[in-house]
Amino acid sequence: MKSKFDVVGFGALNMDKLYRVERIAREGEESFILSVSESPGGSAANTVVGLVRLCAKTGFIGKVANDAEGQLLLDDFRREGVNTDGIVMVRKGRSGTVSAFVDKKGERALYVHPSVNDTLSFEEVNLEYAGQTEFLHLASVDEKPFQAQKKLVEELSKVKVSLDPGEIYAQKGLVKLKPIIKRCFVVMPSENELKMLTGKNWKEGAKILLKEGAGAVAVKLGAKGCYVTDGSQNHMVPPYRTRVIDTTGAGDAWNAGFLYGLIKKKDLYECGQLGNFVASKCIAKVGARTGLPQAREL
C-alpha cells in the first residue's frame, strides 16, 4: 500500500526573527541593524516546506503554544500544503523563536529560544500518523523530544529515516546518536557537523557513519557542493553558481532537494545535484523559505 505521505518531518517549529546587519559583532563590538523581518522556521519544518513546493506530500510532528507565533506557524504550513495533524498545540508556554543576524556577505549568527519545542514527549506523538510515511525526517531537538525520536524510529521499523544532525546532535557524539544512525536510510550532516561527530574529515567521517549502520551519507560542503556515498558509490557533486544573499536555511533546503531525489528514485549523484540546486535557490534570497523553488523550476 502506498504511504499517505512522502515525508513527515520531526523537529522544532520556530518563528525566525531576521535581522540584516552591517556585520556580525564580536564580543565587545557594536554593529548596526539594517532591517528586521519575521518568518516561520525550524530545520525540519523548512525541509518539508521545500518538499511540498516540489509537489511532495508532507506532514509534521512537533509542538507549538496557543499564542500568536504558534498560530502563524500552523497557518503558514497549511497555506503551503503541509499536513499539520501531527502537531501538538498547548495552552501553557510560548512557541519557539530564533533570532538570526545576517551580514552583507550572507553569513549568519543564530540565537535560539526553543520553549515548548523541548517539551514534546513520545506519548504525545501519534504513532499511526508517523507510520503513514515513506520517509521520517529528523532534525535536532532537546533531550525530551530526542528520546521521543529514538523510541519512534524503533517503533516504525518499516519507515525510512533521514537525519540532519545539526550542531546540537553532532555535539552529542556517536554513542548517543547510534540508535538513530543505525536506522537511517541517509544521514545528511554539514562538513563541520561531521567533523564534530566523528573527529574525522568528510570522507573518513562518512565511512564511520556507514559502519554505524547508515545506508548512505550525504555531506553538505557549502561552496564546494556535496559528497554522497553509500559505501559502493562515492561522488563529489559540484555546486550551482549563484549570488549569495542569505545562507539561512541553506542546509534545510539542500535536504529537501536530496530527499525529493530519493522519493523519485534518483541515483545518489542526481540526489546530490537536486540538493545543490534547491540550496542555490534558497541562498539567492533573504530568509529560509523565500527562495525555495517550485517543481516547475527543476
Segments predicted by a language model, with ranges:
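Rossmann-fold NAD(P)-dependent oxidoreductase module
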Residues: G50, D76, G257, G261
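Glycine-rich phosphate/adenosyl-contacting loop at the front of the ribokinase-like
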Residues: M1-K63, A68-L72, R79, V244
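Nucleotide phosphate-binding site architecture
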Residues: D16, K195, R289
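Conserved phosphate-binding/catalytic region of the ribokinase-like
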Residues: M1-F5, F32, W202-L298
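Ribokinase/PfkB-type carbohydrate-kinase core domain
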Residues: M1-L13, D76-M89, V102-H235
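Short, basic and Ser/Thr-rich N-terminal targeting/leader segments
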Residues: S3, L54, G93-G96, G222
